[in-house]
Amino acid sequence: MSVTIVSKRYASALFDIVLASSAVDETEKELNEIKKVLKADQELNDFLVHPKITADKKKHLIAEAFKGVSTHVLHTMYLLIDRGRTNIFSEMTSEFVKLANRTKQIDDAIVYSVKPLSGAEIQSLSEVFAKKAGVTSLRVENVIDKDLIGGVKIRIGNRIYDGSVSGKLSRIERQLAGENR
């Protein structure tokens, strides 16, 4: 079974549990924090996937390292350890965030620009493109991309809105190339 399918199943099960107890936001924060730690600490990842280290030792380390997390998150980690699936934690977290966002009518957007955008510019883009995306609000991440020349390019899910100068030049180039055939 593919990692994506398995990740979605674990994320969905955890989401259903925390939705019933109204702890979606807290769980999302905890999962993202653990994801950051696992991404930053390769030794911890190696420990969790090492076949000669017992599940009990792995669980003990997780319990000590993440003392403040909720029992739902901790037990999900234990389940992943028992089933030898700690490698899907990052993708499971991403799937959980997608479920939480869908419930809250929020989507994530990446805004590429030549220079950092001000808070007002980000807010304005968020309001305009939230309507286009069919959600109430967008969480915007601003990424600097000097190749754009000017303007912005916005990615929301699998949709891209390209209002950059380089994008416009590319479209003009394709049109001219099409006319020369």
UniProtKB/Swiss-Prot annotation:
Family, similarity comment: Belongs to the ATPase delta chain family.
One term of GO molecular function: proton-transporting ATP synthase activity, rotational mechanism
Transmembrane residue ranges: none
Pfam families, sorted: OSCP
Lineage: Bacteria, Bacillati, Bacillota, Bacilli, Bacillales
Highest taxon listed in the record's lineage: Bacteria
Record's protein name: ATP synthase subunit delta
UniProt cross-references to Gene3D superfamilies, sorted A to Z: N-terminal domain of the delta subunit of the F1F0-ATP synthase
Listed GO CC annotations: plasma membrane; proton-transporting ATP synthase complex
Primary residence: membrane
Localization: Cell membrane
Subunit structure: F-type ATPases have 2 components, F(1) - the catalytic core - and F(0) - the membrane proton channel. F(1) has five subunits: alpha(3), beta(3), gamma(1), delta(1), epsilon(1). F(0) has three main subunits: a(1), b(2) and c(10-14). The alpha and beta chains form an alternating ring which encloses part of the gamma chain. F(1) is attached to F(0) by a central stalk formed by the gamma and epsilon chains, while a peripheral stalk is formed by the delta and b chains.
InterPro entries from the UniProt entry: ATP_synth_OSCP/delta_N_sf, ATPase_OSCP/d_CS, ATPase_OSCP/dsu
Keyword field: ATP synthesis, Cell membrane, CF(1), Hydrogen ion transport, Ion transport, Membrane, Transport
Described purpose of this protein according to its UniProt entry: F(1)F(0) ATP synthase produces ATP from ADP in the presence of a proton or sodium gradient. F-type ATPases consist of two structural domains, F(1) containing the extramembraneous catalytic core and F(0) containing the membrane proton channel, linked together by a central stalk and a peripheral stalk. During catalysis, ATP synthesis in the catalytic domain of F(1) is coupled via a rotary mechanism of the central stalk subunits to proton translocation. This protein is part of the stalk that links CF(0) to CF(1). It either transmits conformational changes from CF(0) to CF(1) or is implicated in proton conduction.
Signal peptide extent: none
Membrane-topology annotation of the record: Peripheral membrane protein
